[in-house]
Amino acid sequence: MTDHIRDLFLHPRPTYSIAGAAIVLGMDVREVRGWVEAGELEGIDTENGIVLPWAEVVSFAMDLWSQEVIEEALRDELATVIPELVRLARLEVRVPRFEIVALERLAGREGKSVDAVLARELLDFASVHSPWIGTEVPGFAAALQWPE
């Protein structure tokens, strides 16, 4: 998996064929084609068939692999490929126990970490408040749109 992650982020191509995306994602071509047909990967029709833009493949990969795994795989090159505001940071909060239980149960049901579930929910929060936060924090709008 580390090799796939490093290839995708450190050796990006403008677009990937279905087969190329399958290789870089470590998936079967039929599986990638299924994700395209389901609308989870949005391709562009060309004379040579459907291609997937790099940003689309990266967005999909960020759901396929945890961000912790991606950042660990990129090691020293992390800062060169993922913007600072997009990189993981530690946050300690105190919330009611029922919210923690809810996060843990949902994470377990989805096969994800509590961090991943909470990050997804906070992305929605950040998106809702982005018009204001974008005026307060330089680079916020770009981070919210990354990898576009």
Question: How would you describe each model-predicted region?
Answer:
Residues 24-51:
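Major-groove DNA-recognition helix of helix-turn-helix-type DNA-binding domains
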Residues 55-89:
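A short, Lys/Arg-enriched interface patch at domain edges and termini
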Residues 57-58, 112-136:
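Short, basic amphipathic alpha-helical segments that act as recognition/interaction helices
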Residues 31, 92, 116-117:
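Residues in the helix-turn-helix
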Residues 17-18, 53, 113:
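Residues that mark the N-terminal boundary/hinge immediately upstream of a DNA-recognition element
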Residues 77, 127-148:
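Short, positively charged interaction helices/loops
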Residues 2-31:
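Polyanion-binding surface elements
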Residues 23, 44, 96-116:
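Surface-exposed, Lys/Arg-rich phosphate-binding patches that contact polyanionic backbones
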